[in-house]
Amino acid sequence: YSAEGRLDQLRFFDHWLKGIDTGIMSEPSVKLLIRKGGHGNSEWRFENEWPLERTRWTRFFLQPHARNGDESLGRLMAEAPRKTVSMSYSASGKTKAGVASASWTSTALAGSLPQMGVSFETAPLGDDTEVTGPVVLVLWVASSTEDMDIFATIRNIAPDGSDVFELGQQSQPVPVGKGWLRASQRKLDPALSLPWRPYHVHAERQWLEPGEPVRVEIEIWPTCMVFKRGHRIRLDVQPRDGVGSAPYTHYAADYNTGTNTIFAGGARASYLLLPVIPRRA
């Protein structure tokens, strides 16, 4: 939606539809907008492949950990807990999907609603950290009912605790990335799935057995962000639309009530797989 992006489209169509040599086919095959936090703080960069060959696929393991008495806030760690632990939350949250939980003010500006889902944060980053490429969230989950809606959001948290938003195509504030999955749709096509991109078949419903843990892989759309030194990477896992959802909201299934649980560590390690890009020498 940028001026340069529209110009690239025009150059592409001029080349193929009008036979005009715009030079676009002589450029590298991948062009990325490298976001550095905040509207207007970005730059264009050429690459030769996607995902980037130099990607360091890095697992950030979920670790439940109360901080300042907040039982819903855990940590993203380099190592998984040795023993399996868990965090539970209400499957319905405090609001109705499509009303307060998906409103402009509550999800786009004010941040996540209290007592809705659980969150995990890294420690303050010691250096600027670029994340560019596809993202996958692997969770071990259970529910007290037959299904479970999972809304995953990646956020850029400044040292003062505020969100660093980007600007969406309709000028709305947006977080770093989002992904969604209904647990009954978790079945994968092993031939088409990749370590960094699960491919769900959506051909049958695999209902949950109440209280029985299952493994799910959630695709979070490809993104790019340079998290600045001192910032935190935050992951929200919620039963409803979270921060930065407006105007594209969802309505959760009526049967998704009760209690959802996320497991971490031991044989049920949950993790966020991020494409960390090392600095070029």
Question: Where are the predicted features?
Answer:
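C-terminal, loop-rich substrate-recognition/catalytic regions characterized by aromatic stacking residues
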Residues: 1-281
